[in-house]
Amino acid sequence: MCAALVASTVLAVPAWADLKLCNTTTNRVGVAIGYRDTAGGLTTEGWWTLPGQTCETLFKGALPSRYWYVYALDYDGGGEWAGQAYLCTIDKAFTLKSGGDCAKQGYNRTGFFEVDVKQATDWTVRLTDPGEGGGGAK
């Protein structure tokens, strides 16, 4: 009975993790992320600029959401890593707590790709050149 109590207590503790993104290309990329915050609201944030062959932690601490959304733009070579999850962005550094019609709010409608971190205690998204696997298509 004690073992069952300990196990359920351990499972109830929130996992501390960081969301990291690695740019494995040789080009500079701009990155934006989206997620549901602890209150259930939609948050999008950007822009991080990552030089080629570097990694950066985009979110520190307990991940408030199982599903994360990533959009990246190749500043040097053109192209993007995008998907079918449309979220709001703007052209300068931002944190938006919004949803709904991006255009009506004066924002850009941007297609992000979805990342399911499941119950991971640490997660890294890797941006790769076409044909190398990794996060989204360029």
Could you say what each language-model-derived stretch is?
Residues 1-2:
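Bacterial N-terminal signal peptides that target proteins for export
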Residues 63-67:
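Extracellular Ig-like/FN3 beta-sandwich strand-entry sites
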Residues 13-22, 26-61, 72-138:
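Intrinsically disordered, low-complexity segments enriched in small/polar residues
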Residues 6-14:
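C-terminal segment of classical bacterial N-terminal signal peptides
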